Every structure is written in structure tokens, then in C-alpha cells.
Amino acid sequence: MKVSKSIFLVGVIAHSPKVLAVSNSSIQQATNIFDIDSVVETEVVVISSSETTELASDDEGLVATMMNPDDADASGIGGETGVEVAASNNNMLDNQIICGYQGWYSFPGDGAPTNRWRHWFKPPSAYVTAPLAGDLMVDMYPTTDEYNTTDMKDSGIRMSDGSYAKFFSSARPNVVLKHFQWMQTHGISGVFQIRFMAGLHIDADREWKTMVLRNSRRAAELTGRMFALSYDIAGSAITDAVLDDLKADWIRLVDTENITQSPQYIRQNGLPVLHIYGLGFVSVNVSDTAKVESLIKWFKSEAPLQYRVFLIGGVPSRWRDLTGDSRSDPAWKGIYDSLNGIHPWHVGRWNTISSFDTFHTNIILKDSAYCATKGIRYLPTMWPGFSWYNLKNGTSPINQIPRLGGKFMWRQAYKYAAASNINTVWLAQFDECDESTAIFKVTAKTRDLPIDGKWLALDADAGYSVPSDHYLRLTGEAQKMFDGRIPVRDTFPTSSPTRAPTKRPTTKSPTSKPTTKAPTAKPTKPTKKKVGGVTSPVG
């Protein structure tokens, strides 16, 4: 196989990668080792993590939203096999759209130490073998045809053909690998793997979350995607003590999991990237500013070198003026300013395309300009739509924030790509079915949904009919626009260029090699984009 000099090849044995920089002198060695041939006036609902934790009786926190439609037309968008993210690049955040990845789904008997349904069903159904629709936590039903049957479990929810709805588990390595293969096929760069601090002190919970992290690492290395860790410190039971636990967990992951040694772990300015969500929110119980300041200082300059990071804070949407969802203590301004990166949570902060335009002008552009003056990387949130009917026990409408066939998300992508001070975007979230922000493959047609319960398909908005992989394809197009491979354009993409087939993993053991080889096509020579006033090559 022909290999570009800018690419690393990765072999994985028990999650311990062997890496070779591919150069003229090492291609043969690589082949031998790896066997390779003003603010918006609009009604918005924002829930806190504690509210969701109590609602769902689960460990993790969620933060969410609402909204309303405009008009659009959506036909197919073509994807292409993604090029491996160059592991030698120490500025891997440049010109990237990176997805949040929950990886929080499970079922009894899947091998996870928690041994129950997680995030598909609320208690009491979370503890039964065949749960029913009354305790659903999700509005979207993922497609099931590409997962191994052993990686799914039947529920008690009926399909129209008399079978039962099946659900996958993130504990299964091939499930996570499949998701990363979809990213690879559609040119999506990678993920922030979210690690919830709630419940992490419990051995079984910590092992479950570490199991998923291992799955994501392995999948990233096999597919050439990149990944980094995102800690979530939200949750009704969490206090300021969580900051000490977070530091201890990071040390453990660096020392025992060698997490930052992965060639696909995202690095910026020569440092591993770490994201901490929940800083400064009114709805989050972490309020001791001295402890927060101390933790940030430790990560940036006081920790032993192997634990230091490029630190991104997941912060409230009104962080800059300390109002609304942000704590008002002036000390938080200094905390925000001390971060390497600022990622405001924007899900639900607008509910129409026009209200997004207003929010973008009045808040996001001003946020990004402020960050540019401080030398802080600014990562706005992009999201496709929203619905949490089942999570809220029917008290919120189904399809609360319509997707408009993708036009709602594309408008955000266009505006972000056109903004001179925006160079990295957080896409919420790759696999989020609880609040229906998922971009991975979900049921496209209402007729194909389970017949029990209330569900949301991609054709819910009248006049829109898109395939199950539509948002994967749309994200890939947005990435190409963002890194300069196609022009920045407001026009919604409607062409369908030829798309490479999805690469399927082996159905054998989790540690076996995939049955297909990495794509060998050379990428188009990248253009350059402004990064905080400094021209930087595409990562």
C-alpha cells in the first residue's frame, strides 16, 4: 500500500500502541510490523445535570434545550472515506469539527460490571430483562442492521414485523469500532470521549467507563480518528471534592492506561488536550473558585510534566458577562481567562435559524473576538436539533427543535466556518439519543420505528426525507468546508458524490485486526485558515 509521509500507522496489542512515523526509510519496516498491503428573545429550556440525574435515576448528568423550524430542502449529501488524522501533528485542534461521544449505553449481560440497561431505559425497567416503552429514555431509535447480533439485546418493545426492538451496548468493542468506522467513511475527524465524574468512586462504575474509553481508544487507532478525554463534573450528588477526584483519575489514566501515549490522542501546542465540562454553571454544584483555580494551575504548570495538558473548559453560554447560566462571582472571570480553550455549551440557546443568526452576532462572534485578544482557543457548540419527550416522561413535545432536514445544523456550520476567530467546533453529540442530538445512524422513516412508544424519525419534519446516515454525511461536508477543501457556503449541499463503502470490522474477538485496510487515497493539499490572527496549516 502507498502511504503518505504525513500519516502514522498504528498497531494495537492490548491497547499498547506501537507507532512508526512513516517516512521513506520506514515504510518497509511499517509494512513488516503491521502487515499492511443583544441576546435572542426566544423561549429556551435549559436543564441542569442534577435535574436529569434525578429524572433518570442515573449516574451521569446531561444538559439540554429547545427550539422551532424554518424551511428547507434536503437531498442526499455525499461523503468520502476519511483520511487518517496525522499523529505527528501537535496542533490537532486546528480546523476541526470534533464530536462529543457519550458511549454510555449498556444492557444486562453485555460484560459491563454495571450489568443493567443504561441510558436506553429508566428504572425500574433498567433492571429487567425485557423493558417496555413506558420507561424509555430515548426518542431516537438507532439503526441495527450493521451491528453484530451478539452486540445487541432484545427489549420488550414490539416492531411492526412482530420482532422486538434491539439495542446495542457501548461495552462491546465492535459497537464502538463501528461508530468510528462511520466517522472514517464520512471524513469526521474524531471525538471527545466523555467521562462522567458522577459515580466514578464506585469500582464497577469506574471500570465500566474505563472499558468504554479503551474501546474508543482502540477504535480511534484502528481507523485513524483522533480522540481526547472530556470530564463531566455535573450531577446532583457532586460537590467541590470532585476536583480532587478528577485529578486522581487523570493521574491513574496517564499512569495505568497510558492514555496520552496513544498516537491518536489529540494534542495542541505539544500537550495532550483535556476538556472539563461544568465549570462556572449556576446549575453545577462546583463553586469553590479557589479549588478550581488551583486545579487549573496544576494542570497547566504545577503538575509533573507527564500530567500537564492543554486545558479546555466546558462553560456556560454567558460566561463572558457572568450572567444567565453562568455564576456571577467575579472570580469566575479570572478562571475563564486562565483556560487554554473555552467551549460554551450552546445546545438550546437558539430555536430557529433566525434566532441562531441573532445569537451568533450578539454572543458568539463577540465571545470569539474576546478569546482572540486573550490567546484562548474558542470552540462553539454545533448541534442538529433536539427532542427529549421520553426523558421528560412526555411533559415536553416530541421533536421539540426540528432539524429541518439538516438546514438548521448547516447554518451553524457555515457561520462558524466563515468566522475568522473560530477554528475548532464541538459537535453535540455523535451518539446522543436521550436528547436526540445524535448524528450517527438512526431510523430515517417513521414507518420503520417500533410500534410501541413514542419515537422520532428523521422524516418527522414534513417535506424532508433523508437517509439514516444523512448527518454523518452532512458533518463530513461541514468538515471539508471548515478545513478549506470546499468553499465556505451558506447553500445547503444537495449533491451526492460517490461515497466509499463503509468498512466493516471483523466479527471475531475485540483484539483482532479489522478485515479491511486503511484507505490509501491522498488527501487534497490543505489550505490554510486564520487561527487567532496567525496563519496555521490544517491539522
Regions found by a protein language model. Give the residues of each.
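Compositionally biased, low-complexity intrinsically disordered regions
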Residues: F8, V39-T42, G533
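N-terminal, immediately post-signal peptide pro-regions of secreted/luminal proteins
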Residues: L20-D70, A74-S75
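Residue-identity detector for glycine
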Residues: G11, G61, G532-G533
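Low-complexity, Pro/Ser/Thr-rich intrinsically disordered segments
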Residues: N24-I27, T494-G539
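Intrinsically disordered, low-complexity, compositionally biased regions/tails
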Residues: H15, T65, S75, A86, ...
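Glycan-processing catalytic domains of CAZymes
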Residues: G61, M66-S496
